[in-house]
Amino acid sequence: MLRGWLRLLLDVVFPATCEGCDTTLPAGHPSCLCDACKAALGRAEGSLCERCGVPVASDSPCAACRTRPPAFGRARAAGWYVSGSVLASAVQSLKYRRRRHVADALGAHLAAHYPFPTDVVLVPVPLHPARLRARGFNQALLLARALGRRCGLPVASRALVRRRATRAQPGLDAAERRRNLRHAFRVRTPGAVAGRRVVLVDDVLTTGATADACARALLVAGAMRVDVYTVGRAP
């Protein structure tokens, strides 16, 4: 009870602001997003490629997935990651402003849009140790934990590791991204994923190259199937 009163007092003295639009939140507001921004997070829907989730004319696989099927079974996102959108602002606040609590709101948004089977294990996309030290946390792990709490699912936080540093992906085409990520990941604890259905968790899916490389490593380690779920998807 004392903790609750203390939180209310802090909200009055140091009012929280919405991570989507920077407006002041009411004291005791249960989320880091105002109601308008929560509603504006949106959903990635419409006719989507049945494999990678990119917008297509019909729900059949897109040309890229027909030409080179990804290792993962299915990729879906909670919303479209578009510059200037509430979702993009919230993700950037988490990653670059180090607002770790934003992961709870984004994890809840993802959980609200997809029914996750109870027999899956969540695996976050790992950061290289140098990047992890620089940032101080792995946003994919925070999202996986938030999703796990919401859905009652286990998180294999150390199952997948990034074995080498890679070039930054922006600016690389699809073929360059695949080469950049070749053999970049390995499964450190195969027992955590062998014979299991795995849900790979990350903040944003762009070309799917990172998800594909992770899925290949997980399948080699014995995972039965790998699906990918992210907060945002580049359209």
Q: Where would I find each of the regions flagged by the language model?
A:
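Glycine-rich phosphate/pyrophosphate-handling loop used in enzymes and phosphotransfer proteins
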Residues: 1-235
